[in-house]
């Protein structure tokens, strides 16, 4: 057990020689662009974080145990957990169905008071219904006519991993990527964050596609229709049940007492729903993380192990990419942190005096390429030490990298040539300019 890390301190601007570590006396890192820390004892390796909660410690222990089993080749399928999770999901869906059918029965066969109650319950049933996701629309959506080269590359990767062809590709401004099946028709949607796409080389982009399409075939129960909608429904219920602050101006004693009682009831309901969310998370986390490891292996099979490793390493550089984009936005000075938005602003609302978008992406790539090995090592060590960063579907990045290293090096099954890469870049070019302009405008 290591000591809690102190807040990450910036390196002195004139750091020419290594200063001694205040904890162990070894030399600190000296690059003035990054936090200075001690590679010997991990002093200042990351910001100080609160002690992990019981739920976070249990999640970290499950992640470690699954990694050990997969590395040893002895990881049985969690059938018992799947059955329990399916039963819990059935209760969630039955609750929604009972509320809906009960409200209809009151509306059809009840008296006036019962019909009023049925109308209120019907509104609740509609609000609490399962969400199937919506097919995205807007500027970032690319269809096959607009981007034949990108879809052609995506189809080759999907065929390699055994996944159906994607229905829609969406470009947004996040340093991330995702794959989902949405709508009643269950259309496959691939979302590519342009900052991440621009940070990767051609082969790493194929690894990214292989990983995302791997989610279609890796047996992730959390993404199934029955379990996935139950998890999202429970999360919606929890968000709605959390009490907020209601300001009614002048309030009588009776109103204040009523507010206190309602607040206590909502807090109790929210607590129960949170326990249900965490229960489902615990029951499905093993299958979700196992599926994530399988998606990594499919990325390695598609693009080669080296490219898959490079993809995971680049994902650790999200904060550094945000720094580069913020500096470009503010002309080299300090600027606010780039925050993920629900939608990308249109080019018409962006600043007309924004720098050349190509220069923005070039600066980001140059900054990421200039990050020294010791800083990359710090990010990986902090990922190893941060026990609060484990979620139900994504194992820690350091464990994913370690498991890739357990297997043999795989060659790339899919490659892209200069002509295909240039065609894909040309199809994305208008969106590169639009998203860059929106990011620069803040």
Feature map (PLM): residue ranges:
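Hydrophobic or amphipathic, alpha-helical segments that drive membrane association/targeting
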Residues: 1-183, 398, 409-442
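His/Asp/Glu-rich metal-coordinating catalytic cores
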Residues: 160, 188, 203
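Catalytic Zn2+-binding segment of zinc metalloproteases
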Residues: 210-228
